[in-house]
Every structure is written in structure tokens, then in C-alpha cells.
Amino acid sequence: MIRRIILTMAFLASLSLSAKDVNMGSWQIVPLPQQVKEMSSAPFRITAKTTIYYAAGDEKQKKDAGFLASHIKEVTGIGVKTTDKQAKGQIRLALNAGDTQSEAYSLVVNKNGITISATSHVGIFYGIQSVMKALPITRNVKSVSLPAAEVTDAPRFAYRAFMID
């Protein structure tokens, strides 16, 4: 009898040691981006005060920001707003001039926010997809976190297709 009690207590203790923060996202997503460099700094917390910034007058970015906001609401229950005014603690969508592939994107996540940058709207959309996949699926919480990281990705091929032989 004492042996069963000791085994039960040991089992319960081992469960508490392996418990993870279910409100923490992960960059182990499919398909895995070309480069994921996780940082040891503090994660970014998404709360009801978080906003998604898009460039004023850019209707495509505004639509993408709304898409991301609705997904965050759906999977976490946290209502984030979109805005064309910059502030701290935002998820920023940024178009940058550059010579990278049109569908390439980069993400920078730190305690101050998330920046999704690309040379085209398509790249921003794919960056948003990566953020959506990294979010934890949990409901009715006050905040979720994404680990600090630098993520870079681009399509491996210049075309997307499905072939059946």
C-alpha cells in the first residue's frame, strides 16, 4: 500500500516537472521556414492592448491586418485592433524596398513587438501565415506569448504547383 502511494506521488511530481506554458507559441511550424533563430530574450505578449499596425492608405495591408486580428481572436479569444498609427508593443506590417524574392519575408519578434517585413504584399501575407501557425491554440486567456526570434523565409521554387503523374 505504501509503495502505491509513493509511486502515485512520484508520478504526480513528474507531471508538474514536465508542464509547459500552454500560452506560449512555438516556431516549430510546417512548413519550417528557411531560417529560425530563436533568441534568449523575453517573448512578445499579445494582449487586448496589442494593436496591428498597417501603413496608412494601404488597403491591402489593412485587409491583411484585419485577417490576422480575426485569426488571433478565433484561436485565443483575445481581441486585438488594427491601426495606422505606430506605437510600442505592436505587430507591424512593413513593406521594404529590396532585391529579395517577391514572396520572401522576415519576422523579428522581441518583447517590444513583432515586425513582419517583405518587399511585396504577398510576402507580408506569408509572414502573417507563419505568425498564425506559431500562435498557441487556447481560449479565454488574457495573453499569449510568442518566443523572441528572427525568422526568414522565401519560396524554394519560383512557382507553386501540384502535379499528378
Model-derived features with residue positions:
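Extreme N-termini of proteins with methionine-enriched Sec-type signal peptides or N-terminal signal-anchor
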Residues: 1-2, 19
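Sec-dependent signal peptide recognition
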Residues: 2-8
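Hydrophobic h-region of N-terminal signal peptides that target proteins for export
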Residues: 9-18
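Contiguous, structured surface segment used for ligand recognition
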Residues: 20-160
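Active-site mouth loops of central-metabolism enzymes
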Residues: 161-165
